[in-house]
Design a protein with these regions (language model features):
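N-terminal cap/lid segment of alpha/beta-hydrolase-fold proteins
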Residues: 22-47
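Short substrate-entry loop that stabilizes the transition state in hydrolases
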Residues: 47-49, 58-98
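Alpha/beta-hydrolase
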Residues: 55, 156, 214-215
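The conserved beta1-alpha1 loop
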Residues: 55-57, 183
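Alpha/beta-hydrolase active-site loop
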Residues: 74, 100-121
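Primarily recognizes the serine-hydrolase "nucleophile elbow" in alpha/beta-hydrolase
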Residues: 112-174
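The feature captures the conserved acid-bearing segment of alpha/beta-hydrolase catalytic domains
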Residues: 152, 157-210
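C-terminal catalytic histidine-bearing segment of alpha/beta-hydrolase fold enzymes
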Residues: 206-244
Length: 244
């Protein structure tokens, strides 16, 4: 009888650990390599540097880092381009796959990434920006309306997952950071509508922001590349974060 109870206790502990692991994310990262947990790109010179945490879209969650890069998802190029602009750039590769149920742990991973950056000696803790596209854009907004320590947000073609985008819009009054909002004209109606809704709510709440709807092609995939839009991001970040 005691042995049966002991086995039952072990089973419950294993289940509890497994359930908790869905939300847990290590603050230590395997940087770079074939199967990285994150990318980290440093500018030339000595810090402390202004910093960027970049949140990728759902394509990486769906097929994994290696396949996404082979399909044109140029996270290394984005990371290097932002670093060339003078920003120490960190790109966490989210764990857990796509879907609504993984959004809370993905949000927790963004928070962990910000805290990780604040511990780096060559990061200026007072000058950290959060950027992201699609699912990463939604996560950027969700975190941005809750934290007061972010210097700027860049939100590209944000997605609606469940009602999380709508819920974040209802919290815009608490937003402190200036926002750069981007979308490409050829993107799908969902992302155009989300762009318009966020633009409207930012305007109604008299928040500091700039919105750009590009008309140069690329659609939703534009923000998977290290493309022309990064120049606007670098100008915005230099204005809000300053140089080294």
């Amino acid at each position: 009888m005691m042995l049966r109870k002991f086995h039952g206790l072990i089973f419950l502990l294993v289940c509890a650990i497994h359930a908790h692991s869905d939300l847990a994310f290590s603050a230590e990262y395997r940087i770079g390599g074939v199967n990285p947990e994150a990318l980290l790109c440093r500018p030339e010179g000595k810090g402390p540097f202004p910093a960027v945490v970049h949140n990728h879209g759902v394509g990486v969650d769906t097929v994994g880092y290696q396949k996404a890069v082979k399909r044109g998802y140029d996270l290394p190029g984005i990371c290097k381009e932002l670093a060339a602009g003078g920003f120490l750039t960190f790109v966490p590769i989210r764990q857990g796959g796509p879907g609504l149920r993984n959004l809370p742990p993905h949000k927790a991973q963004v928070l962990e990434a910000i805290d990780y950056m604040k511990r780096l000696a060559d990061v200026d803790q007072s000058r950290i920006a959060l950027t992201g596209n699609s699912r990463g854009g939604l996560l950027t907004l969700m975190v941005g309306v809750e934290r007061s320590d972010l210097k700027a947000l860049v939100i590209m073609a944000p997605a609606e997952i469940g009602r999380n985008f709508s819920n974040a819009l209802s919290q815009i009054s608490s937003l402190n950071a200036p926002v750069l909002l981007l979308v490409e004209k050829g993107d799908e109606p969902e992302f155009q509508n989300n762009f318009d809704a966020l633009d409207r709510v930012l305007r109604e709440n008299k928040k500091e922001f700039k919105s750009i709807r590009y008309d140069q092609g690329g659609g939703h995939s534009l923000f998977h590349t290290a493309g022309y839009y990064l120049q606007d991001i670098k100008v915005f970040l230099h204005d809000k974060l300053g140089g080294k």
